[in-house]
Each structure stands twice: as C-alpha cells, then as structure tokens.
Amino acid sequence: MIKVLCLDYDNTVFDHRAGKIPESAEKALEAVRGKCRIVLASGRFFNDVWNAPIKELIKPDGIIHSNGSMVEAEGLVLKETFLDPKLQKEVLDFAYTHELCLGGLYEGKWYTTNPEKQLSRWKGKEQLFRRELHDAGMLYEIPMHALSLDDTVEAARLIAENFPGLRTPLMNEITGGADVIPSYLSKAYGLTLLLKHWGLGFAETAAVGDSMNDLEMIQAAGVGIAMGNGVSALKEAADFVTADISEDGLKRALEYLELLS
C-alpha cells in the first residue's frame, strides 16, 4: 500500500507550456488527499515569497525544498543545509569568468551572473519579466540552499567537471538548465529523513518526476514513475512511464498506483 506520494512540481504537477496545473491533475490530487501523505519535492525553495503560494495551493504533508537542502514534515523543519560559503563564491566567480547564467532567488529577488542570457532564456515566460534582475555578486555573503544554472547542457557539465563538491542534475536534456547543489544532496536524501520521521519505509512510497533531479528519488521509491515529457534517463530508470503532463500524465500515474479507485 502506498502511504507516501512524493511529487516533483515543475512539469510534473505544473505544466509550464500551458502555464497552469492541468484540471485533471488538480482533481486527482484532491481525490488522493487523505489516502496517503503527499510530499512536494522540488528544486524550488517554497518558503520564499515567490514560491510560498504553491505550498498553500498543494497543501503537502511534507516538503523537500531545493533538492533536499531543507526538509519539512507538517511544518517542522527536520534538516536545513546551505552551500559551503567558499564553494558558493568560487562557482559564482567561475560563472562570471565563463559567461554562464548562474544565480538564484533570495527574498523575492532574482540574482544572476548574466542578465542578458537570463532574459533570453526566459523568453516566452513573460510572467518572469516582472522580476527585476540583480547582480549575483550580491550573493557572495548570503547563505544559499542552492543555485540555479539557466544555461546549456554543456554549461552544466562544465560546472560539474570543475567542482567535484557540487552536482548539476539537468532539467532538460536538450535545452539544459540545472540545479547546482552539494554533491551529497538529493530528493531521495530528503525522502529518507521524512520516512524516518514518520516511521515508514521506502517500500511504502511512490514518486513521480520528469527531470534528472528526480532520478535518485525515482530509484529509491517503492514505485518510481516518470512523466511522458521527462528526460530519457529518468524514463529508463522508472518502473512506469505515464503520459505527457498535457495528456493527463499525473492523473494516469495516480491511476496506475490505484490511488484514484
């Protein structure tokens, strides 16, 4: 029996192409509520003013923020981890030197090493243009849970190759984009902490995701499901591949888990 349902957010629950959560996904989540614990697992930090409304919308029992850098159960913080300050400065300097687009969100403001590239990468996401861009150099002295690389696949590899203490799980195997996190963190790490807190095991869990930051979580869960719009490596690792998010993918995943019957 599935007692914990662990869900990625971007392009698993929220369809970026449509700019909304599919109606079928909304109804499916409401139908599941109360049948098992819902965990929201993302590269996002949901306590920031930009992302807090998502937390209120989904109302999860547990949250794995920033790929495991902060883990909450019913509002109780179980663990919080920040990037090493020296390593954080070094990777930001590296991004400036190589003209990479690296940055992150802090207290509702977006910081970047490359404003021009950031605006280009955000093209078609007009809702983000309302956010003023700030110099990522201001992040040197700010504790960050993670950084966001909005750049190519090659850029992600470049950082991973030069910083063994960091890893850069890809969001998309064609357009790139990656989270920049400590090498030991993952959503699976966060799920481990939640299960220990709840006194449950991985065999009682299911996980659904679409990108490489979901890989360890998909592999660790009792049942791992990849979205039809997910990256190929995740689909290969999954126990089941559901439909594309725009084709009722999340609903079909929950049907497969027999959570909607």
PLM regions: where:
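Short, well-ordered alpha-helix to beta-strand connector turns
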Residues: 2, 35-36, 60, 143-144, ...
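Asp-based phosphoryl-transfer active-site loop
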Residues: 3-18
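Hydrophobic "anchor" residues on beta-strands that sit immediately upstream
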Residues: 4-6, 62, 200, 206, ...
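Active-site phosphate-binding/coordination module
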Residues: 22-119
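Hydrophobic/aromatic beta-strand patches that form the interior of the parallel beta-sheet core
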Residues: 39, 64, 206-208, 225, ...
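Short, structured coil segments at secondary-structure junctions
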Residues: 56-59, 67, 162-164, 220-221, ...
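Asp-based, Mg2+/Mn2+-dependent phosphohydrolase catalytic module
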Residues: 201, 220, 225-261
